[in-house]
Amino acid sequence: MPFLNPLRPIPLLLLASLMVLAPQPSAAASGVGYGASMPANSTPASSVQTDSGQANSASPNSVRQLYRQRRWSDVVAAVPLPARGQPIPPADLLLLRSFALAQLSRLADSAQTLRIAARAYPRDARFPTELAGVLYRQKHYAEAARLLRRALRLSPRDDYARNFLGTVDFLQGNLDAALADWNPIARPVLDDQQIVPAPSLPPLLLDRIFPFSPGSVYTLRQYRVTQAQLALQPLFAAVSDELQPQPDGHFRLIVHTIPHPGWRTAPVANLLSTLRSLPYQAVDPEFWNLRHSAVSLVTYLRWDAQKRMITAQLGSPIRSPDQRLHLDLDARNENWNLTRTLTANASIVPVATLQPALLNQERIRAGIGLDELFGSRLLWQTSVGFSRRRFRSLLGVPAASPYFDNTSAVGLRSSLRAVLVDSPIHRFDLASTLAVQAHHYFTRPLNRSVRLSAALDAHWLPASSGDRYRLHTLLRAGDTFGQIPFDQLWMLGFDRDNSLWMRGHNGLINGRKGNAPLGARYLLANTDFDHLLWRDPFVSVRFGPFVDTGRIYASDEGSASGTSGPLFGAPRWLTDTGLQARLHLFTSSTLVLGWGHDLRSGSNTFYSAISH
């Protein structure tokens, strides 16, 4: 194996100890047998000429002999660092000096020697590798990893450096990067796999999600596919992988799972999860793994007098963990106050003559959908459904507008999500989503309509290990073609039923929807930067600033009440900023608390939401 090669003047015993996660000094830090591993063709001092034509005073053979005799101080004295303008000693002598300094526990001086040598011999991969060993001993893992990547750029086939790099990433908790580093050298090899606790799921489904054969290499692709399948199939509340090193250099894979709380297994946790939306006059009854068949039923019931809602989804894997079939139901009865939304454009209604604009909307939609994974990078989702909407109690609203026609429709929804960039080394990923919704209405003049939307979703963890800091940016755009009913308009603002958040714009007014800008097309950018403040087994707290900016454009459809021009939209760009806290609870729920400030109007909004 590479790290047992006696001809390698690099930290020979470090990787053997790292593979069992018992960190030991590198050769640079421990001085392990370097004299025996010096290249046999080292140039004698008498034949090594410096740029000034002067020969070095110490020969490699004599310094090697001092090193074999463990005379560390004499080695250091025999190879002094040159003063400015003096010639640099040969590379082999600088390596011996750094090893001897490490044996004297002078790690800082050893690192200084290696840095000088790396500048003098920039194409010699041994120096960044040895310096990484010293920095590893000093627990500077991030810089050690950076140096090892530099060494691999100089010597791409250096299996030892690649093994070392994978180990450093593994010790930092960056399993993705460790697998990316190890896989080219056929590591890590799995001897065993355990799922703890053992789930009561169909065995065939488990075997397909967690494939295993003794002696196989655990690949990054396998890990990513499993993560994508678990995101598609809500089989567990949480899952984490643990690689346990074995004495023979192989690994055991432990898959730690947290099951969804059940009424029999965890009645208290299940009750808390069901009541998590109680502050919003709602409950979340959820039933997981029905009859141990991986079938789930997720429902949401809200009895708020201004916005009643019932949603339900019955889902199950089909044929393989890459496919999920689901039946959906969404029924709503909502009171809307459009007073400010309709008058956003002063050319329609003068602001000084505001009149209440109220309506009640009833809508029900039922459909069936199929979600399918292609590897770990592509997710295709499609569904067909039937919907019916009815508008009542219109006050101050142009009732003759097609927006408010009572109508039924059949619709097709389809989306494709693709991972464009996935860099475990830089801890950055970028995904794109394209979605289309097409509807055929049975009431004229609506006829047909199409809604298109696109998104770019970027995540970055700036630190080399952990998730203490996190940056998330989401860019979205949408457009509408054809005449649409009111419920198909986009909305920019904070509303727990809305995904297009502008957190400085409250979507409610006196509990009724309609306070946020509406329109037929939009652009939106959301950026969040948060910091992990606290984490324990029961709760984790993240806090940080955010910036939302966007524009929503009016529809071309005017009212039929004597006015001309669009009914909805915002005349200017909107920009909000603020602070947000996220509390992830042991019930697998996340509570969001925030303050948003509208930079244009100066208004403030306090908001909260909870998700599972």
Predicted segments — roles?
Residues 558-612:
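C-terminal beta-signal and terminal closure region of outer-membrane beta-barrel proteins
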Residues 102-103, 110, 115-121, 126, ...:
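Periplasmic polypeptide-binding modules associated with outer-membrane biogenesis and secretion
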Residues 60-61, 91-96, 126-130, 160-164:
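Alpha-solenoid helical repeat scaffolds
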Residues 58-85, 96-105:
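Alpha-helical segment of the N-proximal tetratricopeptide repeat
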Residues 409-541, 545-549, 553-555, 560-563, ...:
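C-terminal outer-membrane beta-barrel translocator/porin domains of Gram-negative envelope proteins
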Residues 22-40:
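Signal peptide processing junction and immediate N-terminal pro/mature segment
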Residues 10-22:
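Bacterial N-terminal signal peptides
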Residues 227, 232-431, 494-510, 515-525, ...:
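Gram-negative/organellar outer-membrane beta-barrel architecture
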